[in-house]
Amino acid sequence: MTENRDNKTSQSEKTTQKKKKKKFKAFKIILITFITLIVISLVTAIGITLAIIKTSPDININEIIAASDASKIYDDKGELVDSIITSKKKILVKYDEVPENLINAFVSIEDERFFKHSGIDVKRIAGAFLIDMKNIVSGKPALQGASTITQQLIKNTVFETHGNSLNDKLRRKVQEWYLAPKLEKEVGKKSIMEAYLNTIYLGGRAIGVGAAADQYFNVSIDKLDLVQCAFIAGLPQSPSVYYPYSRTSKKDPSKYINRTKTVLAKMKENGYISQNEYISALAELDTSKSTVTNDESIQTLGQYTIHKPTNIDEKYNFEWFTRPAIERVKKDLKDIYNYSDDEIEKLLVNGNLKIYTTMNKDLQVSTQEIIDNDEKLNSLSSSKNNLVEPQASAVLTDYHTGEVKVIIGGRGTQPALAYNRATNAKVAAGSSIKPLTVYSAAIDSKLATAATVLEDSPLPEAMSKKYSAPGTNWQPKNANGVYSGYLGLRDALKNSVNVYAVKLEDKIGLNTGVKYGEKFGLTFDNVDKNSMAAIALGELNRGTNTFTMANAYGVFGNNGMYSNPRLYTKVLDRNGNVLLETKTQATQVISPEAAYIMYDLLKGPVKEGTATRIQHTYHSDIPIAGKTGSSTKFKNLWFCGLTPYYSGAVWIENKYGQSIYSSDAAALFGKIMNRAVENLPEKEIEMPEGIIKAEVDRVSGLLPTDLSYKDPRGSQVYTELFIKGTVPTEQDNIHVSTKVNKYNGRVSGSYTPSFLTESKVFIKRQSDSEVPLDDDMYVLPDKDKKSSNKSKHNHNNDAKHDNTNNSEDATNEASTEPSPNTDTVPEDSTNNLDPTKNTEKKPSDKKNKKHVIKPIIRPKKHF
């Protein structure tokens, strides 16, 4: 028994030992794995760090101090055309000239252990690391500052073009840690502080403390007192926030005043000033003068007046183009690298960037000359507030690439930062909007074709009310005051017929017009989006400009693609690295087929429509197309168009109602485009395969019949372009043939002798118009009207007179006069009488010499 027990105990101990061995083995494996991972991580981290360090740039203090060359601007051929005009001011100072209070103020607020560390502050880094860990866990932005003044100097002068992503920041931080001690060993603290104080941006125009002393207090650096030193030292953290003349500071100066107090508190904390000095300084800040005066152009800091920087009046060589290009570069730096405004400003002023624009210098120069010296504009020229009138703008774009080639923002000599009408104006587009929001929208959505016929006549009451304000009756007018009657889309666009555009927009829907307009790059406010006058006729509330319109019209030559406008191709940093680069980005706005049809339609105004004056100024064999536009009272005059090379827009501001029209804008456009293509080979835009040519009837927009060729105005058959699948399938139903009395033109009837009758072709109308229409004389005459067609065209455009000549309904009763040569033979109204009705001849009235017949009914199918 005892032996068995011992055996069991022995076996149990062995089992326990085995379990312990297994646990130890598992622990050993885990420990080895953990250590291995740590080692691998450390090795990897060291490797990455060494790799980052290896790519660190070489630096020396002389290059850092001199690293303030302004960025350069180049044209599309790589020729230097401008240098960044620095609004900044720099007054270099020596270390020994700087007040001790100013140095101590910067050290206290920016790097309190500056004179103790060797370039990096380990204690500060550790504190920042803990904060970063908390921020990462909580999802807040990580990477606290912890930068010493030495690191800031390196960052501001060496790494200014590096990105602001997390990876970029980590890389830059490692390189700063490596370079900072290296720099301190080479030059020492005084040289580093001097370089820092001379290169730091301090708001307004001030680069460096010398310029800041002059700008804010109008004193030299050695004359700054304690409060002034504290104010200047508080600026670097965020010069735009603490700048006294920012919008926020004008309303609430407490931001920069409280920042100054913070600097003073840190100076006291670090033992640089005494308690009494601190209290005295606060007292100076807390006087009644520390609030904004009634004059918001003057800011104060306690008892001190803070001077406002004077404006820079230096102009760029190519002011109209260079400034928009720089603004685009600024926007992209902010979007891509998340740079602050202050960082971008410093980079442009000191970064020695190379900005390659899309500007064609020769075209820019020639276009400015053409606009400045235009004979018609100069004949009307007057000077208002030292500004030549009328003003104008123009833009040319290579729509294939999106590269903007010309921007002209005004006429005549104008100052720096003058209002750029090409990029900043917001004016009504007039009829130049129609190809974008009406005709393209209708054709691309296949709700209409280039042959679609509508009646050019006053809006029906229901349609008018839909777009009228309560209690009003909106009726758009055509420019010539004439209504055409049946009208096709091609002719409506060619002659800029307003009523047709409104009716077509109503057919496709206002929202459709808005949607297409936005795809073309237009922007609408809520007023515009609900206004037929805005979307169909261009009476925009928000407005547009030549920059937008020039790029929009490029769609018609680019297979329906809208190329995002580009003002620069690339930006290089001082080391030749690509900082920014643009590529052609295009989006499909309309189909290639719709685009080509629109391009073909837009040749109409130039050849025989509203823009024929362009033929006197454009002499190239390269095709040109486009559309005029004018807003109410001819305040804004437009021509927007394209060739197979460029699209463009010209706008003339007729502010004072002078004798100038959209045709003058077309003539000006012709001069500009003539110069643009004069040395280019002849070229045409190719027609896509998805387009079909088909013969149609111009009056109905349908397939022609024999009567289409016999219209009294001549054959109404022509060849039109259609997107495949949109060719009409129905035959013309507007033309009719009937017999008429040769002598009075009225429809002959059963009593009209055959020798007095002849067959004629007419058009028929579904309903009568309240006003005369141009094609009334070709409408099938009613039985009850005497020379009704002719009488309508002998109108004087008076509404009351016009209404007396309206045709009556076919079922109305009436009497007819006999032909002068057939006194005893009354005329029937038609030879298509309803066979169920009888007509009866009554005795003639000798006195009135008239023959009266019974009422007749005209079958509806004939009308």
UniProtKB/Swiss-Prot annotation:
Q: Where is the composition biased (Basic residues)?
A: 847-863
Region Disordered: start and end of each range? 774-863
Give positions of region: Transglycosylase.
71-248
Residue spans crossing the bilayer: 29-49
Report the membrane topology from the UniProt record: Single-pass type II membrane protein
Q: Where is the composition biased (Basic and acidic residues)?
A: 837-846
This protein's GO cellular component annotations are: outer membrane-bounded periplasmic space; plasma membrane
Biological role stated in the UniProt entry: Cell wall formation. Synthesis of cross-linked peptidoglycan from the lipid intermediates. The enzyme has a penicillin-insensitive transglycosylase N-terminal domain (formation of linear glycan strands) and a penicillin-sensitive transpeptidase C-terminal domain (cross-linking of the peptide subunits).
UniProt protein name: Penicillin-binding protein 1A
Gene name, Swiss-Prot/TrEMBL = pbpA
